[in-house]
């Protein structure tokens, strides 16, 4: 019925947030707990989850979500959780707690062993989906600030499920030739919507390049193109901006996003606001990068603030016309090696709502000047 149905604006997407209880503001949006709970409650056939790691039992709300998944699996709903091979620390405990859930570890880069599964998304029944920066952990559900998108528009959910099929093909328990055969089968039908064919003003972008498949857009290409074409404003809320790629313990300069930000400020006079995280998960280069941007653009309209509470929100807004929500840092290692899916939209309402979130965070008491 999809070809004959009108496409709703924004593909029925709603913003989803986790806000820690110690923050001085609340959200008007769906919470991550409510989003995951709704996906589980409405599921009839399957729930597929992709996350670097799986540690929902670390908080009370995370444990409640896992218990609901357990109940769903006991009713015959097919549940598959994809984890990165290096994020399976709690796997034994979870399997013993719920043997009906199928946990699959993946290795998206067996050849070089440097790529990780970073993607954070849920898909159910080809009808509902979540994509954002909330991994399947108790912290992301309850105690760490995150941002994502929920949609119950079937065509969008189906398109995201194709990404799940791609990552699932890299099951670390399979032989390499089986992985290649599986990937060859799923990649040719890898997406229906992209930057040149969004649905309701929405499309996904992907990384890394060797997992793109037919018609998919490389995330770094879209992000850099948007930064380089910015005319009036760039708002960035990220855990880290790191202009390096790490391989085998060595660091290599990767200035693509970093340079695009500087060029926008200096060459075109674009107003830029950068809100970075400052907690123990930060790359050591992150604060140095923020300070260098602040120093290089001291004569330009570029401002940098630091968010003092655990913040895993990864948000980009360009010219108040485009929004990008992802699970990856603006980090060369993430963009060159890791597997993830990002949400993109040019829908005016979604961009406006995301902008309000950025403005709220920017002026909050938790945002401090880099110079303090």
Swiss-Prot record:
Q: What is its main location?
A: virion
Q: Induced by what?
A: Expressed in the intermediate phase of the viral replicative cycle.
Q: Which SMART domains match?
A: PLDc
Q: Which UniProt keywords apply?
A: Host endoplasmic reticulum, Host Golgi apparatus, Host membrane, Host-virus interaction, Hydrolase, Late protein, Lipoprotein, Membrane, Palmitate, Viral budding, Viral budding via the host ESCRT complexes, Viral envelope protein, Viral release from host cell, Virion
Tell me which EC number(s) this protein carries.
3.1.1.-, 3.1.4.4
- Residue ranges for motif YPPL? 153-156
Q: Can you name one GO molecular function term for this protein?
A: phospholipase D activity
GO BP, one annotated term: viral budding via host ESCRT complex
Give the signal peptide, or none.
none
Task: Give the matching CDD domains.
Answer: PLDc_vPLD3_4_5_like_1, PLDc_vPLD3_4_5_like_2
> Is Membrane one of the keywords UniProt gives this record?
yes
What does the UniProt PTM comment say about this protein?
Answer: Palmitoylated. Attachment of the palmitate moiety is essential for correct intracellular targeting and protein function.
Domain PLD phosphodiesterase residue range list: 307-334
Reaction(s) the record says it catalyses = a 1,2-diacyl-sn-glycero-3-phosphocholine + H2O = a 1,2-diacyl-sn-glycero-3-phosphate + choline + H(+)
Protein purpose: Major envelope protein that plays a role in the biogenesis of the viral double membrane and in egress of virus from the host cell. Produces the wrapped form of virus that is required for cell-to-cell spread. Acts as a lipase with broad specificity including phospholipase C, phospholipase A, and triacylglycerol lipase activities.
Subunit details: Interacts with protein OPG190.
Domain comment?
Late-budding domains (L domains) are short sequence motifs essential for viral particle budding. They recruit proteins of the host ESCRT machinery (Endosomal Sorting Complex Required for Transport) or ESCRT-associated proteins. F13 contains one L domain: a YPPL motif, which might interact with PDCD6IP/AIP1.
Name of protein:
Envelope phospholipase OPG057
Organism this protein belongs to: Vaccinia virus (strain Copenhagen)
Recorded name of the encoding gene: OPG057
């Amino acid at each position: 019925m999809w070809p004959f149905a009108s496409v709703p604006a924004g593909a029925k997407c709603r913003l989803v947030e986790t806000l820690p209880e110690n923050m001085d503001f609340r959200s008007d949006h769906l919470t991550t707990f409510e989003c995951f709970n709704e996906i589980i409650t409405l599921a009839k056939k399957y729930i597929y989850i992709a996350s670097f790691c799986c540690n929902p039992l670390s908080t009370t709300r995370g444990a409640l979500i896992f218990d609901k998944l357990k109940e769903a699996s006991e009713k015959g709903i097919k549940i598959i959780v994809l984890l990165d091979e290096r994020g399976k620390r709690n796997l034994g405990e979870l399997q013993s707690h719920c043997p009906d859930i199928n946990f699959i570890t993946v290795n998206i880069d067996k050849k070089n062993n440097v790529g990780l599964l970073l993607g954070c998304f849920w898909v159910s029944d080809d009808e509902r989906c979540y994509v954002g920066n909330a991994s399947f952990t108790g912290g992301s559900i309850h105690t760490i600030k995150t941002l994502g998108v929920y949609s119950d528009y079937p065509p969008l959910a189906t398109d995201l499920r194709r990404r799940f099929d791609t990552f699932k093909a890299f099951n670390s328990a399979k032989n390499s030739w089986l992985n290649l055969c599986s990937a060859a089968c799923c990649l040719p039908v890898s997406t229906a919507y992209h930057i040149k064919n969004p649905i309701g003003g929405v499309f996904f972008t992907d990384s890394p390049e060797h997992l793109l498949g037919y018609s998919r857009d490389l995330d770094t290409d879209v992000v850099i193109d948007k930064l380089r074409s910015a005319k009036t404003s760039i708002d960035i809320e990220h855990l880290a901006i790191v202009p390096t790629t790490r391989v085998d313990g060595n660091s290599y300069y990767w200035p693509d996003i970093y340079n695009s930000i500087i060029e926008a400020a200096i060459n075109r006079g674009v107003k830029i606001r950068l809100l970075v995280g400052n907690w123990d998960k930060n790359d050591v280069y992150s604060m140095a990068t923020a300070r260098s941007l602040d120093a290089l653009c001291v004569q330009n309209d570029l401002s940098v603030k630091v968010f003092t509470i655990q913040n895993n929100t990864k948000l980009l807004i360009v010219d108040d016309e485009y929004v990008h929500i992802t699970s990856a840092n603006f980090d060369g290692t993430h963009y060159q090696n890791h597997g993830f899916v990002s949400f993109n939209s040019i829908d005016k309402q979604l961009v406006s709502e995301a902008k309000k979130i950025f403005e709220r965070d920017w002026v909050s008491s938790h945002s401090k000047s880099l110079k303090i």
